[in-house]
Amino acid sequence: MRLEFRAAALDDADSVAEVYLRSRKELVACAPLAHSDDDVRGWVRRRLIPAGGTTVAVVDGLVVGLLAISRGQDCGWIEQLYLLPGWIGCGLGAQLLEIARGELASPIRLYCFQCNERARRFYERHGFRAIRFSDGAGNEEKCPDVLYEAASPSASPRRPA
């Protein structure tokens, strides 16, 4: 198996959109997409990839994951982190998270849908803590979400006793 992480190129747009759409539909069905598949594909091609900050995880030539980051005035943001469903649990999400940590200044923030319990456990296991819960009025899906922030470098995830 050949694994590489690299900056997304416009040639990756269809594959990146496929990862996003499959992951959202199969793993986050509790937060239905606010846009059509074609609109998502256009957004990836015209906005997400050209904005920079998007990394793809590629296994044997197949895009299986994506990470999109941005830099705010007082924090770094993980805008998107998605894997094809069959690649969850293989360590790729953790590797993408480490790429974000290497690129972004602290603190690092991200939003996650409250109903996406698997992703919430993943982020919490990797040192993120919930700092605000909302009713979803501020997101396109109108689905309750939670704002996470990376724990300080001195903090470590709690292990069960």
Predicted regions and their residues:
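A short helix-loop-beta-strand connector motif used in the catalytic cores of GNAT acetyltransferases and
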Residues: R45-V56, W77
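Conserved GNAT-fold acetyl-CoA-binding loop/helix
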Residues: A17, L21-R45
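Conserved beta-strand in the GNAT
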Residues: V56, L62-R71, W77-Y82
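Conserved GNAT acetyl-CoA-binding A-motif
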Residues: E103-Q114
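Conserved acetyl-CoA-binding loop-helix of GNAT-fold acetyltransferases
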Residues: L83, G89-G102, R121-R125
